[in-house]
């Protein structure tokens, strides 16, 4: 890289001038080798990788260079390129002239913009991290080894061996930097960060993460991350493959910053100046001017491309959806520039009036969801509830599909239930293109106001997916799946008075029960009560804070039962009078209290935050029981394991109820468990540190996963036993 230097001559009439000089000293070498860099690990990774890229450019070698990321099996950071290599003179010079590795500001790349380097500092960057590293050169039939080290007089280089290249040896340079164990993860992160612009250039060994490689692009690359992104929002220059922030230079409002959260902009080599550390740009007047002009040019280009694309769009709905996803600033920028959209030349306000759901759509019909327990929902301009379908969710711009059913026959609830059953059958030919939990808008053909709204709905969803079926058509397809209701002579309830949950084929299934009060004796076993959407105990004192059938299933699994009932108000009094059912809340409370009483106070295992992520998994998987010795001095009892599993299963389950209620009893047990675990955690952090140090691979693997597969559990057990042997 050509480094631009500006010269300005100031004339005077004084005495003879004298040149400045720098005295070579350990202090100077320390400044140039270590103090120059703020992020020392990134400096080592960046400089050695870019040197390899330059080496391959030097002899036009398209082969991939090799990076070895340090780890427990090989604690070295290794960079091996397949460039031309270097001669002994190139590396260490002679008595009259120093080489590239034992001199500063000496570079072979300063006269060309074809290379990334140019300051003559990068090859010495390992000294910012370590006092010694090795160099091996494969050049003109010889392999020469060197060790570079720092002593009291500054950096030194010493030859270690010379031998002939073998038939399989290739020219190039190999740099080996020893790495401390505590820095393994940092080196891995920096490799994944620095390599993003260099896709398909390297073979990377030992890296435990994916690299978010940049795609191929000519001018700029915009990103709106939906997950963690290593660069904070703003503008970044990519110069010589290195990413530099340039937000501080740009003051004016620009489309790139509005359009994308993060923007990477390529700059031609030679157009910017960089600091010697290459950690930042050198923001002189020329560099600032080039940055401002480049951002302005690309911002205008990007804006014109977006405007052109929007104007050529034939779908107002898709265009409006994209504008809504852009956010307020982008929409405001376009409106302020009087942009018109689509081939219909629509304004933003016109599209807004076209696609924001009107209140009249609340009269379009009723809604059911495709599941085994379909419930009627009325359409309202409000938030979603168990009885309300929000018009914004049903018709809004982010909805890309609508299923319309012409309600031409009776029995829609059973037909929807039959459809849900059919969709569970892998052999069912789903020509309807309707899927589980999708919404069905039922339009009554005899209600003129609903039929009149059908063209408006179809116009709203132009270019999106609109499925229209007659209910009779759906019935014909799912007839064999529709549940048969055996009618009793007595009048049946209009809605389910109970729900039965039972395990079939290894999974929980829910079935509606339409029972009269006189038939309440058919219900036996474990029950919970339900009123509206609330779920509570038989005595009525305790309810779930966040009512969910899944929580009841979790409670049933803890108790160890394979069926239970949820009773609605019509049957509750009679079921209680019969006395043949047990409350599932009470059963859980009794089991929980018994499990707590079975564990002696001195048998608790410390649950510090650092140990928790390991202990939770060890308790969950019996095959890993032997590992508990690394986190607890005492042997973990079966009673403690049982209690800890119950506590873990009840995480996130909260109960309403005052003192002397089932919910309060359950809360008390959980609270006491936490207190006793915290009291036992005084040695926990120390044991975790020892485990992490001794078993780094297993620690990293197990510590950052929410769950483990059976194969992973077996592999961990096998690895631990081998390492501990």
UniProtKB/Swiss-Prot annotation:
GO molecular-function term, one example from the UniProt record: DNA binding
Approximate repeat spans: 101-179, 481-559
SUPFAM superfamilies on file: ATPase domain of HSP90 chaperone/DNA topoisomerase II/histidine kinase (SSF55874)
GO CC, any one term: membrane
BP terms from Gene Ontology: DNA replication
Keyword terms of this UniProt record: DNA replication, DNA-binding, Early protein, Host cell inner membrane, Host cell membrane, Host membrane, Membrane, Repeat
Keyword Repeat attached: yes
Record's subcellular location: Host cell inner membrane
Keyword Repeat tagged: yes
Source superkingdom: Viruses
Induction (UniProt): Expressed in the early phase of the viral replicative cycle. rIIA RNA is translationally repressed by the regA protein.
InterPro entries reported in the protein's UniProt record: HATPase_C_sf (IPR036890)
Chain residues forming the annotated DNA-binding region: 544-570
Function, as annotated: May play a role in viral replication since found in complexes carrying several of the enzymes synthesizing deoxyribonucleotides and associated with DNA and host membrane. May be required for maintaining membrane integrity during the process.
Name recorded for this polypeptide: Protein rIIA
Gene responsible for this protein: rIIA
């Amino acid at each position: 890289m050509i480094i631009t230097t500006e010269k300005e001559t100031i004339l005077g009439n004084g005495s003879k001038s004298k040149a400045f000089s720098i005295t070579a000293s350990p202090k100077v070498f320390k400044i140039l080798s270590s103090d120059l860099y703020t992020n020392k690990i990134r400096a080592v990774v960046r400089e050695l990788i870019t040197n390899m890229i330059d080496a391959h450019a030097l002899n036009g070698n398209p082969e991939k260079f090799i990076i070895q990321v340090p780890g427990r099996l090989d604690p070295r950071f290794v960079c091996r390129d397949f460039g031309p290599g270097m001669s002994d003179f190139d590396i260490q010079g002679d008595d009259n002239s120093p080489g590239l590795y034992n001199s500063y500001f000496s570079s072979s790349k300063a006269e060309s913009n074809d290379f990334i380097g140019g300051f003559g500092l990068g090859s010495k960057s390992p000294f910012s991290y370590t006092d010694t590293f090795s160099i091996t050169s494969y050049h003109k039939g010889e392999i020469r080894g060197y060790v570079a080290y720092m002593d009291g007089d500054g950096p030194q280089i010493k030859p270690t061996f010379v031998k002939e290249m073998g038939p399989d040896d290739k020219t190039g340079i190999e740099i080996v930097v020893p790495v401390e164990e505590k820095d393994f993860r940092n080196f891995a992160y920096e490799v994944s960060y620095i390599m993003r612009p260099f896709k398909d250039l390297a073979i990377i060994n030992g890296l435990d993460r994916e690299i978010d490689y940049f795609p191929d692009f000519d001018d700029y690359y915009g990103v709106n991350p939906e997950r963690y992104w290593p660069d904070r929002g703003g503008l970044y220059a990519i110069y010589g493959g290195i990413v530099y922030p340039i937000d501080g230079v740009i003051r004016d409002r620009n489309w790139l910053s509005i359009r994308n959260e993060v923007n990477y902009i390529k700059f031609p080599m030679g157009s910017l100046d960089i600091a010697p550390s290459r950690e930042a740009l050198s923001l002189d007047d020329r560099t600032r001017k080039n940055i401002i002009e480049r951002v302005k040019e690309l911002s205008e280009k990007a804006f014109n491309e977006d405007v052109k694309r929007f104007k050529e769009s034939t779908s107002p709905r898709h265009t409006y959806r994209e504008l809504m996803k852009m956010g307020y600033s982008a929409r405001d920028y376009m409106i302020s520039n009087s942009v018109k959209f689509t081939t219909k030349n629509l304004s933003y306000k016109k599209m807004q009036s076209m696609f924001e759901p009107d209140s009249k759509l609340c009269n379009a019909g009723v809604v059911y969801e495709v599941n085994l327990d379909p419930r009627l929902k009325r359409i309202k301009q409000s938030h979603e509830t168990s009885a309300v379908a929000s018009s914004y969710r049903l018709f809004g711009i982010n909805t890309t599909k609508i299923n319309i059913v012409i309600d031409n026959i009776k029995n829609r609830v059973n037909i929807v239930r039959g459809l849900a059953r059919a969709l569970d059958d892998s052999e069912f030919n789903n020509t309807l293109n309707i899927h589980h939990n999708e919404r069905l808008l039922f339009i009554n053909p005899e209600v003129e106001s609903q039929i009149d709204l059908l063209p408006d709905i179809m116009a709203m969803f132009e270019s999106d997916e609109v499925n229209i079926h007659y209910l009779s058509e759906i019935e014909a397809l799912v007839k064999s799946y529709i549940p048969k209701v055996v009618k009793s002579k007595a009048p049946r309830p209009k809605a389910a008075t109970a729900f039965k949950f039972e395990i079939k084929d290894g999974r929980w299934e829910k079935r509606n029960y339409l029972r009269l009060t006189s038939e309440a004796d058919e219900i036996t076993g474990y029950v919970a009560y339900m009123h509206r959407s609330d779920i509570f105990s038989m005595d009525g004192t305790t309810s779930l804070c966040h009512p969910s059938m899944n929580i009841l299933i979790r409670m049933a699994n803890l108790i160890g039962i394979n069926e239970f009932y949820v009773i609605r108000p019509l049957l509750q009094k009679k079921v209680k009078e019969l006395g043949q059912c047990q409350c599932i809340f009470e059963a859980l409370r009794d089991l929980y209290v018994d499990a707590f009483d079975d564990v002696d106070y001195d048998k608790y295992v410390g649950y510090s935050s650092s140990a928790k992520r390991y202990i939770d998994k060890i308790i969950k998987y019996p095959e890993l029981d032997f590992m508990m010795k690394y986190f607890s001095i005492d042997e973990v009892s079966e009673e403690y394991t049982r209690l800890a599993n119950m506590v873990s299963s009840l995480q996130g389950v909260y109960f309403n109820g005052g003192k002397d209620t089932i919910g309060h009893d359950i809360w008390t047990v959980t609270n006491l468990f936490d207190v006793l675990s915290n009291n036992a955690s005084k040695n926990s952090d120390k044991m975790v540190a020892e485990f992490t140090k001794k078993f780094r691979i297993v620690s990293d693997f197990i510590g950052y996963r929410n769950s483990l597969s059976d194969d992973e559990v077996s592999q961990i057990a096998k690895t631990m036993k081998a390492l501990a042997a």
